[in-house]
């Protein structure tokens, strides 16, 4: 009886000691509050559950939709819905979590996007946001965001103006 209880306890401890990193994620060990080691891509990671956790960072493409009122060259506010497609570079995941924390999307991506989109849209007329210059506006926002975020470990794949009102 004691052996079976000990065996069940050992098996449950082993299962609590492993974490699965799925495809499109990297895992970084956090031991006693400090990030240690290098990011590990998909697979099983074994940890000591009382002192270590795994911080998972998605490296697949993320689609972030944002609704904003953007200024135009005439001084009008144009309501818009815009999508940002981006991903995190696997080798920079540790640096991102160390520098910014788990809330990196709100802190870096969205604040940079709001600034870049307001700067770019203020150079165009409101009618240009509905016409053929839409692609130019998207490309300018993407270039400005990429310039600011590429050294921090983010790849901006695309910026899409979905609806303009």
Question: Regions from the language model: what does each represent?
Answer:
Residues 5-13:
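Sec-dependent N-terminal signal peptides
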Residues 19-121:
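Hydrophobic membrane-anchoring helix/hairpin
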């Amino acid at each position: 009886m004691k052996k079976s209880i000990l065996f069940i306890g050992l098996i449950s401890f082993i299962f609590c000691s492993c974490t699965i990193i799925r495809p499109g994620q990297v895992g970084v060990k956090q031991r006693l509050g400090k990030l240690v080691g290098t990011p590990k891509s998909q697979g099983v990671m074994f940890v000591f559950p009382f002192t270590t956790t795994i911080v998972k960072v998605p490296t697949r493409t993320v689609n972030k939709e944002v609704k904003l009122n953007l200024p135009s060259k005439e001084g009008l506010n144009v309501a818009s819905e815009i999508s940002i497609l981006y991903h995190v570079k696997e080798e920079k995941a540790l640096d991102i979590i160390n520098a910014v924390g788990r809330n990196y999307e709100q802190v870096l991506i969205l604040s940079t996007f709001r600034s870049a989109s307001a700067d770019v849209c203020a150079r165009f007329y409101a009618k240009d946001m509905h016409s053929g210059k839409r692609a130019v506006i998207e490309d300018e926002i993407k270039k400005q965001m990429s310039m600011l975020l590429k050294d921090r470990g983010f790849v901006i794949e695309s910026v899409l103006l979905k609806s303009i009102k």
